[in-house]
UniProtKB/Swiss-Prot annotation:
Protein origin, superkingdom: Eukaryota
Requisite cofactors: heme
Keywords, alphabetical: Heme, Iron, Metal-binding, Monooxygenase, Oxidoreductase
A GO molecular-function annotation: heme binding
PANTHER family: CYTOCHROME P450 71D8, OS08G0105600 PROTEIN
Organism field: Panax ginseng
Protein's UniProt keywords contain Membrane: no
Family of this protein: Belongs to the cytochrome P450 family.
Protein function: Probable heme-thiolate monooxygenase.
Name of the protein described by the UniProt record: Cytochrome P450 CYP71D312
Tagged with keyword Oxidoreductase: yes
A Pfam family this chain is assigned to: p450
């Protein structure tokens, strides 16, 4: 397994090993005993039938360094504290009303994206970088408020974290060898990032508290409530089993920023990649978008709710290219028998969502991009159908699905409405390199560069 850790094709390698050794496969990763799940049948056992037994997270050097007292939602151990953090996230931060409230941010940032593309017509455009800038802006403004120097600094730190996530810390594989903790090249990089995060976060909290004291509404760098304001309000009013601390707020904000930026940008670049590679689908989805939005020069989220084929295109993209190709690892907290094998306590659980989404035993012509397949398959983002788990499933599934999907749908609709797209240098669709690179998310190995030609001008 160690030779796979340094490759760009770890998802492929694990899938190939599973074809030889079975859908539940044991791996010895240094001192860490791990099992890899590569089928929906076994995933159902660990994510549904025995979900609580596999609800913990393994302790990693990175989380110990980056988090304050290991307080957050994503990597905290399962229990009363985790349940409170989950409630905070789903009820206060990512409920339907809050996602809708941030619609104006998404619409403004999509407008900026469209304008930036209009200024570069007929020239190769690095869409990967444009998508990253867009999702960074949407998530940061929703989280901390107005555009500012702090936002720019924060985006850079989040990008640094994402780049480090592509590697691994050998001390995580040999936790008993203390010398490795000292010699690890990852540790000083993480410590540098932590210092930057502390400085940025403390300034963000200070600014928010000062502005809350100055405004009658009690919040707002811009007079509107962002997610930091929400958490400060929750902290002030209390009423939870555990008092909401500044460390909790730090952890949740970090979860939001990491979870809401790279994943959405990755989904956008893969969707556009698949559309360029599949002209039939591109023509069909553009026809739907342009018919539904015909005559409009200013477009809002409400205008795109009926774009059913666009939604199928996004679903199919996430089947083939789940941003978290290997779901965040879990830890067995209670010994269980899975698929006839006894799984001991403290075994690390790895779920290959990429392999499950391409399983030819369930998906017809599994490697082909066919959005229409979802007309006949009951599969949504809620994790009920274990053959389709781009956001995970069970207690630990992603709580930010609505926010993430909203951040993908609108820019796609507008880019397809306003522009025609082609590959540069006369390249044919089938020649587009679709190689992947494994990191914080499963991104394209090479940036997606396309040429846009104006079709329907936007309202300046």
């Amino acid at each position: 397994m160690l030779h796979l850790a340094g490759t760009l094709q770890i998802t492929h390698g694990l899938r190939d090993l599973a074809l030889k050794h079975g859908p539940l496969m044991h791996l010895q990763l240094g001192e860490i005993s791990a099992v890899v799940v590569s089928s929906a049948r076994v995933a159902k056992e660990v994510l549904k039938t025995h979900d609580i037994a596999f609800a913990d997270r393994p302790k990693l050097v990175s989380t110990k360094i980056l988090l304050r007292n290991e307080k957050d939602l994503v990597m905290s151990i399962y229990g009363d504290y985790w349940r409170q953090m989950r409630k905070l996230c789903t009820v206060e931060l990512l409920n339907t009303n809050k996602v809708s409230f941030f619609r104006s941010i998404r619409e403004e940032e999509v407008w900026r994206l469209v304008q930036s593309i209009q200024s570069s017509l007929e020239s190769p455009i690095n869409l990967s970088k444009r998508f990253s800038a867009f999702t960074n802006a949407v998530t940061c403004i929703a989280t901390i408020g107005k555009r500012s120097q702090l936002q720019d600094e924060l985006v850079q730190v989040i990008e640094d974290i994402a780049s480090l996530a592509g590697g691994f810390d050998v001390s995580d594989l040999f936790p008993s060898i203390k010398l490795l903790h000292v010699l690890s090249g990852m540790r000083p990089k993480l410590q540098t990032i932590r210092k930057k995060l502390d400085n940025i976060f403390d300034n963000i909290i200070l600014e928010h508290k000062e502005n809350r004291n100055r405004t009658n509404k009690g919040y707002g760098l811009t007079g509107e409530e962002d997610l930091v304001d929400v958490l400060l309000s929750v902290q002030e009013r209390g009423g939870f089993e555990f008092p909401v601390t500044t460390d909790d707020i730090y952890g949740l904000i970090l979860n939001m920023l990491i979870g809401g930026t790279d994943t959405s940008a990755t989904a956008l670049e893969w969707t556009m990649s698949e559309l360029i590679r599949n002209p039939r689908v591109l023509e069909k989805v553009q026809a739907e978008v342009r018919q539904a939005l015909k005559g409009k020069t200013t477009i809002h989220e409400n205008d795109i709710q009926g774009l059913s084929y666009l939604k199928l295109v996004i679903k199919e993209t996430l089947r083939l290219h789940p941003p978290l190709a290997l779901l965040l690892p879990r830890l067995c907290r209670d010994e269980r028998q899975i698929d006839g094998y006894q799984i001991p306590i403290d075994t690390k659980l790895i779920i290959n969502a990429w392999a499950i989404g391409r399983d030819p035993g369930y998906w017809v012509d599994a490697e082909s991009f066919e959005p229409e397949r979802f007309d006949n398959i009951s599969a949504d983002f809620n994790g009920v159908n274990l053959n389709y788990i781009p956001f995970g499933s069970g207690r630990r599934m992603c709580p930010g699905i609505s926010f993430g999907v909203a951040t993908v749908e609108l820019p796609l609709a507008l880019l397809l409405y306003h522009f025609n797209w082609k590959l540069p240098f006369g390249m044919k669709p089938e020649s587009l390199d679709m190689s992947e690179t494994f990191g914080a998310t499963l991104k394209r190995k090479n940036n997606l560069c396309l040429i846009a030609t104006s079709c329907i001008p936007s309202n300046n």
